[in-house]
Amino acid sequence: MGIVSPESGAAALKALDKAMTDYRDDAYDVLVNCPVEDSNIHIEGYKFTGISKYIETCLGEGNKASTLYISDNLRLMVAAERASVKDIANVLTKDLVKEKATLLFKTIRRDFNISNPRIAVLSLNPTAQGKEEQEIILPAIKEMEEDSVQAFGPYTAEEFFENGYYDQFDGILALYYDQGVPPLKALATGSVVKFNANLPIIATEPDCHTRFDIAGQCIADASSLRHAIYTAIDIYRNRKRYDEPLQNPLPKLYREKHDDGEKVRFSIPKKKHE
């Protein structure tokens, strides 16, 4: 107990595989997983890089998972979440910023019951006046405005977190991990939960390590796991509430105009005796 072993890795993989199978069989509604030691899980022909990527591969249906960090009233997503620091400037594009900010907007609207969320986009450079801000971030924000996505910025991370600007927004898009996640954790008064956004399955997990050093001592804090469970339940209810009215929309009434072919809504022809 309290050490990494082949048996514990095999047991973790067996539990994950069972969870994937049971979800396909509609055996449960949400998945809450505990931390696992990634290096201890070995799958022939597949490199295990984390639970999020594994769930994406098994149940993503072609969608790419994006981690949403949740703490108190803060929700943060990372644009270049899998890129190393030295590659961030090369990975960052207008399409990536727009894609991630729009995903964050739609996720908060659907899964957190906020009808028109406000998204803050952080800058790459300390002055927010660099080439990346002028040629990538600002054009992306402009295009999102035209698509009715409420995105604002770019804000420097120091100014944004130091002055408490985060209180004015429903979601935050950081450009890389160290820019956003450490400040979020520092500001958190409780535990942080990770949610795998953009997947059909609702999957959450506490943002903590395996802590083999305290295994079996009954001193672990269960609040983070409890928070992950409650968050998954809330997201399930919000998503169901959001999707239900969209299941059977009323059909639109159109009539073709003979002169120019444009469709006119709700244009009902008069009766002959009128």
Enumerate the predicted regions with their spans.
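Anion-binding alpha/beta catalytic cores of soluble intermediary-metabolism enzymes, centered on
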Residues: 1-274
